[in-house]
Amino acid sequence: MIDDFAPTSSTGDAALYRLLSWLSPAYPVGAYTYSHGLETAVEDGLVHHRQSLADYVATVLHDGAAAIDGPLLAASWRAAQAEDHARLDELAVLGAAWRSSAETALETSAQGRAFCDVTQAAWPDSRFAAFCARHDESIVHPVAFGVASCWQGIPLRAALFGYLSAFAANLVSAGVRLIPLGQTDGQRAQAALLDDLQRATDHGLNTALEDAGSAVPMLDLFSIRHETQYTRLFRS
């Protein structure tokens, strides 16, 4: 089992390079087009400054989608490590069904499909290609990311912490544009989330899927209401 990066190892460097590439805003999965209901929260005045933005993202990490996607990513990584393809297929179906609104389903499935396409093109792996082909449009981002991370030699904790950090950073970026905030305040909000990200990572690593779930109906309602919001910059 791969536990950590070896800083002096070329293998560790290669895995880190892949992870950083996949988490970059330049990786073409379209993350920047989604606000995860934040646009409606800003419209309602619930999120209106740096602290309320950080609080919103922390809530998503602990009780929202990340509380599901963390355990889902970890389970996918472990199933890929075991080469348990039947379990991977189950997780792909579960991940697609485990969404609270049409827009959150679109958000994760569109990014999952885009991640499959670009990762197969740039970092080809026959097992990953076959897995993505079996699920076509239904594969969600955390499942695809967990599977690819395992088969490309990226340690589980690094993959999960990185995935959640990129998810949080994308929401902060959306908040900077929507509220609006200055870039420095955006970075302060991001810095304030470190403890939340570490706790969310621990939750993802240590929570069985049967014990995972979200518990923030207000966030779900923001996402549902966003579907008919009059003026929108984001797809969710």
UniProtKB/Swiss-Prot annotation:
GO CC annotation: cytoplasm
State the disulfide connectivity: none
Does this entry carry the keyword Cytoplasm?
yes
- InterPro entries annotated for this entry? UreF (IPR002639), UreF_sf (IPR038277)
Q: Which GO terms describe its molecular function?
A: nickel cation binding
Q: Which UniProt keywords apply?
A: Chaperone, Cytoplasm, Nickel insertion
Can you tell which superkingdom this protein's organism belongs to? Bacteria
Localisation: Cytoplasm
Signal peptide segment:
none
Q: Which family does it belong to?
A: Belongs to the UreF family.
Provide the function of this protein: Required for maturation of urease via the functional incorporation of the urease nickel metallocenter.
Subunit structure and binding partners = UreD, UreF and UreG form a complex that acts as a GTP-hydrolysis-dependent molecular chaperone, activating the urease apoprotein by helping to assemble the nickel containing metallocenter of UreC. The UreE protein probably delivers the nickel.
According to UniProt, the name of this protein is: Urease accessory protein UreF
Q: Which organism is it from?
A: Granulibacter bethesdensis (strain ATCC BAA-1260 / CGDNIH1)
